[in-house]
Design a protein with these regions (language model features):
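Surface-exposed, charge/polar-rich loops and edge strands
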Residues: 2-50, 54-185
């Protein structure tokens, strides 16, 4: 008699889609969830309408997993899809490392995620020393922590740098409150 096949352990992941529901790229949360279910992932949940997907998988090759998801997004939604893929546990560690005030009535707390560490290094280098009266930027493990004045998140020097085409395929930014919502599941 054959022994029963041992089920592999699944890991909770977070896919952060770059540029969704801005710049004319509109994807409904229900459609996004359906795609991830069709890809065979478990416990799929979308968070907010800004391209955040939580899912379980037993796939361990992060690069292959990221490529598979990006290709499926491109095919289904007909746009140049890029994601940052993280284990939820890793995201929790990144959020815990946020070095600035988490609640500040005058500033937004952001985390810049990257799929290519060299690009994050380059952003830090090109940003140079930022004016702390305007914004704050600090490198963390696999992320950049950024804080900028409310109402100016597209106008500061760091914001303009992050908006450059060069970084679109490898970085995406989330408000710290959004990151914390992604950790509650």
């Amino acid at each position: 008699m054959a022994s029963p096949k041992k089920k592999q352990q699944t890991t909770r992941h977070v896919a952060l889609l770059r540029g969704v529901n801005v710049n004319g790229i509109t994807i409904k949360s229900a459609d996004l969830k359906a795609l991830f279910v069709e890809l065979g992932f478990g416990a799929v949940r979308t968070v907010l309408a800004s391209g955040n997907v939580l899912f379980d998988t037993d796939e361990s090759d992060a690069g292959a997993l990221r490529t598979r998801i990006e290709q499926a997004l491109r095919k289904r939604f007909d746009y140049d899809a890029w994601i940052v893929l993280l284990k939820q546990k890793t995201m929790a560690e990144m959020a815990a490392g946020y070095p600035f005030e988490r609640i500040d009535e005058e500033r937004h707390p952001y985390v810049v995620f990257g799929s290519d560490p060299a690009m994050l290094d380059e952003v830090i280098e090109k940003a140079g020393s930022v004016d702390p009266e305007v914004e704050r930027l600090k490198q963390g493990q696999g992320v950049l922590y950024w804080q900028c004045p409310r109402g100016e998140s597209t106008d500061t020097p760091v914001a303009k740098l992050l908006a450059k085409t060069r970084y679109k395929s490898s970085t995406t930014t989330r408000n710290l409150r959004t990151v914390e919502k992604l950790l509650t599941d």
